[in-house]
């Protein structure tokens, strides 16, 4: 595995920043639980609860709608590694190249590798209607957001941090898909907390998207 290459890539994206790690653990845990709850379970500590591979395999089954190979139920380390490998092999079968994420790191509870794996799963399975092959998954997600929000005043999505601080991009995405849920014309850049809370409340109540982000965190952090 080329750990150096992966770490450099994650460093550019801010994934190695301690504040990012804390926020992403919270966000990714909420995302995982929004799917795992459909199978009657959940996780609490993201780097611990995927270590035996069972909930990781279950998560992939829930979000893909496809069965994975039968998991090993043994408690030994090699059973856990076998289960995580089944999950990783499934992800790779979907055309995702896992540069440096190995089963051992997940079984050992490596926070950075676990977050990187979940981020990879989100990009591959949560954003499926973008097929610009030459772009990275992150760039495809950015392009999708730009396309959806292009018609809206005061929205200019250039990144995944400062472009979202005033809440208008979130509101624009909701309005683009469900215009009856909010009146975009009444929103202003001057009230970011209102915009963010409105978007998150509507997403949770009407779109079944769990509230994963905190409006105050986004508004007051230098680079959310």
Residue ranges with predicted function:
Residues 1-224:
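Alpha-helical coiled-coil scaffolding segments
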